[in-house]
Amino acid sequence: MSLLKKTVYLIIFSCLGCQIHAQKSELTSQLVSQYEQYKEPSLNMRRIKHEDITPLIKTLKNKPGVAIRQVGSSIDGRSLNLLSLGTGKTSIFLWSQMHGDESTATQAIFDILRFFTSPTANPTRDLLLKKLNLHFLPMLNPDGAALFTRRNTLGIDINRDALDLASPEGQTLKRVRDSLSANFGFNLHDQSRYYNTERTAKPATISYLAPAYNYEKDINEVRGNAMRVIVFMNELVQDFAPGQVGRYNDDFEPRAFGDNIQKWGTSAILIESGGYQNDIEKQEIRKLNYVSILAALHSIATESYKKISIDAYEKIPQNDRKLFDLKLEDVSYNLLGKMYTLDLGINHLEVENASHSAFYTKAQLVDIGDLSTYYGYETMNGAGYTVVPGKIYTPKPQEIPTYKNSIALLKKGYVYWKGRITMPEKGLNFPMQAVSDNFKLPDFRFYIGLNPSFLLSKDGVITHAVINGYLINLFKETSTFRNAIFLR
């Protein structure tokens, strides 16, 4: 090929790439700016249940162009519903929450359905409905959702039931997939908020995977198309969460639905919703699901994904799991009269109420030592700071704990508030650990599993407190503190 021809081809592909990028930017700007008008207001937390989405499905029955049919039932008898719309030739199947405690995409699905059923004029919506035949199966595991737990009532992981089909939920997913023979499938999950993008301190807010369909991890047209759409979504999400997209491990799992759906001929795309700074209920990540899924549908409807090279798929950084909620670096710690310098990794575990509708956090010390290859949502350089065990404060009669007086007590070395206090289901709203009248402080030492509550001093002055795993600067008003707990 002559130099002139090569130059011409480069110019053509460069212009084509610029055109695609410009179209994508315009589309995403539109989707983001309009999101709030389509967001389903009744869903605003992770712990949603079948009874929360049932009235939304009933409302959608009255919308023109929407077909709803019950395609199965869970073990406990909750309905599994398929919502279909669009008249196009390209069939797309989206399902969510096969793990009951992974609800971010379920919320996004109802945002997307509001987008599609809105009466206001929208050229993007019209194009998608004309080109695509869309099928949504939200909350595949409603029994697990009722308890906010991963597995179903049978106690199995539905995502490891693609071969045995022991569960009615797994049977339903297989039957629907086969009846649709969908061109594309979106397998929508949540992952731990402690995943980061490899070798960075950034959380893997969204992770993608085009699952392998064999141990060799071969790439055929079906899997290649899934990779192309993922590359498109990755470039889009980078605009809103730069460096916070990961690539899920693609080792073949012969029992998993995603891997088998890829094998059965549907281009399977796994989307995992991870963590995002100060977004415990994952509402920002929900928005990213909404935008990226609709943009992906647009790329399929216009077939623009076909112009994307799969080489960029491998360039998406892999997931790693090296995040803590709080990382303290190089703090000085006195043990048996000898000073040690070490790092601390602390995570916040969620403790649910009886109805699995609310929670408080109970922190745990999960790692100690050299944590230089780990990161934190919040990190403090503790060089020069010394760990100070806290004292118990006995309040005066009628004295009530508040945030303000707790800060004053922390500065004096008190960490524990003695007295009868009823703990709300979302925990105590003042930054001291409550203890009973007969509570005895054990000898202070760090160990894995400890609920970390202590003070930090510098040059003899107490400057910071760690209460139930939350770091509090005692001389600043801002803090990530969420709740303390009652220690018995």
Show the residue positions of the predicted features.
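Short beta-strand/turn micro-motifs at beta-sheet edges
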Residues: 77, 123, 257-260
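Short glycine- and acidic-rich boundary segments immediately preceding or forming the N-terminal edge
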Residues: 24-79
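Surface-exposed patches in mature extracellular/periplasmic domains of secreted proteins
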Residues: 68-72, 121-126, 244-250
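Acidic/His- and Gly-rich active-site-bordering loop/insert found
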Residues: 75-100
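Active-site-proximal beta-strand/loop segments in catalytic clefts of secreted hydrolases
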Residues: 71-73, 85, 96, 137-141, ...
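Bacterial Sec-dependent N-terminal signal peptides
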Residues: 1-26
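Active-site/substrate-binding loop(s) of hydrolase catalytic cores
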Residues: 89-91, 98, 103-243, 262
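C-terminal accessory segments enriched in acidic
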Residues: 3, 22-47, 180, 209-218, ...
